[in-house]
Design a protein with these regions (language model features):
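The serine-hydrolase catalytic nucleophile loop
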Residues: 152-164
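Conserved alpha/beta-hydrolase
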Residues: 166-192
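Non-catalytic accessory segments flanking enzyme active sites
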Residues: 65-142, 343, 352-355, 359-374
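Conserved hydrolase catalytic core segment
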Residues: 165, 169-171, 220-269
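Short beta-strand element of the alpha/beta-hydrolase
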Residues: 143-151
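C-terminal subdomain of alpha/beta-hydrolase-fold enzymes, centered on the catalytic histidine
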Residues: 290, 298-452
Length: 452
């Protein structure tokens, strides 16, 4: 427990962290009276005297939880095979059985647990809930503070491979002046953060909490980035424009114009006069909403109902998440081309062990908006610089024409040739290069010293 005297937590600089080989690193420099919090503890019940403290965090799940998981996996009651030769009915039986066979026999959760525990992880209480986060400081004195937000069915694991390139660019083909300090929180209800006990934790509220987090860490100025829900939250922060937020970067932008959204919602043909890129975006989104959006409808309307099965069956949870890995990676429906089995199972197992199937789905219920539509996301209200990278495997490829209309303060737009919805996870080096380029103009703004 922490003493009554507020103590400062110091994260080791990135120079001492061999991320490239994901080795176990040196211990954190922490006050002797601080004890690490484990994942087994109730992160919704921090003592009152820790209301604004920043506490070290370590993951440790009881071995009984892992034994229970393996027993459930091995006892799966499998259904019959799909009646089509493709993925049009969902995850194919043979694909899921191959993944689950590995999960139940050879997969080792302890590897990723050790990898995460080698990172400087912390927890702090904001707006009544504990927020867990990774915080890695660069050894470069003028590093730009960068807040990164994950989405669903992702987690902080999406960004582990980017920490080295972002914080220590000279070892990864970059320049010293491209360095970032990196802050990667788990959203409320996700991973190792606390689970909301009341309604109201929508993207706007999360955005406010993230600004509190960055200010609590001592950053006067910073930038924010995200994909999936992370994009929605970055947009929300852009609208809020808290003091010190210099700009945002999103890789799932909300660009669909009102007239196009109306036609799509009505099931009408594409409006006349669309360019080739605009028509391709319209067709991609029409296919998504007509054939692939069932997961979202369930979580928007009945997160509790769908969650019972996901909380009780690890294979049900795996299928629910693997379906999105197959559809949203730049892999042609074969996610193992973009992510390893271990990477996918690390994420699935994190959701299972943290019991976050329902709590993560509740964010959809809280935000029943179309996250692709510019009007729903009120992107025109964003007054700070906005950067956008379009990845070819994203749910839709935002056209430059729509993006400029949606974001009047668009400062950077780039279409890349690989990567999908899980951009940082699939292409960590490319993702890093995009953030370097997107935020480089903001480093020299007069009167905005970046680091504390």
């Amino acid at each position: 427990m922490q003493t009554t005297k507020q103590m400062e937590l110091i994260a080791a600089p990135a120079k001492s962290w061999p991320f490239a080989k994901h080795a176990v690193i040196t211990s954190l420099i922490l006050a002797a009276s601080l004890m690490p919090m484990t994942a087994a503890e109730d992160s919704n019940s921090a003592p009152a005297n820790q209301a604004s403290s920043i506490r070290p965090f370590q993951i440790h799940f009881p071995e009984a939880d892992l034994v229970d998981l393996r027993n459930r996996v091995l006892a799966t009651r499998w259904p019959e095979k799909e009646t089509v030769p493709d993925q049009s009915q969902g995850v194919q039986l043979a694909k899921l059985q191959a993944l689950v066979r590995y999960w139940g026999t050879d997969y080792d959760w302890h590897k990723v647990e050790t990898e995460l525990n080698a990172l400087p992880m912390f927890v702090t209480r904001i707006d009544g809930i504990d927020i867990q986060f990774i915080h890695v400081k660069s050894r470069q004195p003028n590093a730009m503070p960068l807040l990164i937000t994950h989405g669903w069915p992702g987690s902080i694991l999406e960004f582990v491979k980017t920490i080295g390139p972002l914080t220590d660019p000279t070892n990864y083909g970059g320049r010293a002046e491209d360095a970032f300090d990196v802050v990667i929180p788990s959203m409320p209800g996700y991973g190792f953060s606390g689970k909301p006990q009341t309604t109201g934790w929508n993207p706007d509220r999360i955005g406010h909490a993230w600004d509190v987090l960055m200010k609590r860490l001592g950053y006067k100025n910073y930038v924010a980035q995200g994909g999936d829900w992370g994009s929605v939250i970055a947009d929300a922060m852009g609208r809020q424009a808290p003091a010190g937020l210099l700009g945002i970067h999103v890789n799932m932008p909300a660009t669909v114009p009102t007239e196009v959204a109306k036609a799509m919602n009505a099931g009408d043909p594409a409006p006349a006069g669309l360019s080739v890129q605009e028509r391709a975006a319209y067709d991609s989104l029409s296919t998504f909403f007509n054939k692939n959006a069932g997961y979202g409808i369930m979580m928007v309307t009945r997160p509790q109902t769908v969650g019972y099965g996901l909380m009780d069956s690890p294979v049900g949870l795996a299928a629910w998440m693997y379906d999105k890995f197959a559809q949203w990676t730049y892999s042609g429906g074969d996610p193992e081309r973009s992510l390893t089995k271990d990477e996918m199972l690390d994420d699935i197992t994190l959701y299972w062990l943290s019991k976050s199937a329902i709590s993560s789905a509740q964010l959809y219920w809280e935000n029943n908006n179309n996250n692709f539509n510019a009007a729903d996301q009120k992107t025109a209200d964003i007054k700070i610089p906005v950067a956008v990278t379009v990845f070819p495997g994203e749910i839709y490829q935002a056209p430059r024409s729509w993006t400029g209309r949606a974001y009047p303060t668009l400062s950077y737009f780039h279409e890349v040739n690989k990567g999908g919805h899980f951009a940082a996870w699939e292409e960590p080096q490319l993702y890093t290069e995009e953030l370097r380029a997107a935020f480089r103009p903001l480093r020299g703004i007069p009167g905005t010293a970046l680091n504390q």
